[in-house]
Amino acid sequence: MAHKKAGGSTRNGRDSEAKRLGVKMYGGQAIKAGNIIVRQRGTQFHAGYGVGMGKDHTLFAKVEGVVKFEVKGAFGRRYVSVVAA
């Protein structure tokens, strides 16, 4: 009789769901208060004028205007601001 031995198990076989991180609104785009600008882990981008930061480091617009990205300071930090259109 033909037989096939039972296959072994592996410790792989799972994968986490993508978190959809990244820049959601780019420089020069019009934005409304409350809209998300960047979803991130840690502060890759820092909050500038008119921008708030959530507890998961998400940057969002506090005022209506246009998104502006800039590099400031001796450490070359990247800031996101919302300026009036």
Curated annotation (Swiss-Prot):
Domain of life: Bacteria
Keywords: Ribonucleoprotein, Ribosomal protein
Pfam families: Ribosomal_L27
Gene3D superfamilies assigned to the protein according to its UniProt record, in alphabetical order: 2.40.50.100
One GO term of the biological process aspect: translation
Protein name: Large ribosomal subunit protein bL27
InterPro entries noted in UniProt: Ribosomal_bL27 (IPR001684), Ribosomal_bL27_CS (IPR018261)
Gene Ontology MF, one: structural constituent of ribosome
Keyword Ribosomal protein: yes
Family: Belongs to the bacterial ribosomal protein bL27 family.
Annotated S-S bridges: none
Leader sequence segment: none
GO cellular component, one term: cytosolic large ribosomal subunit
Natural source organism: Stutzerimonas stutzeri (strain A1501)
Lineage per the UniProt record: Bacteria, Pseudomonadati, Pseudomonadota, Gammaproteobacteria, Pseudomonadales
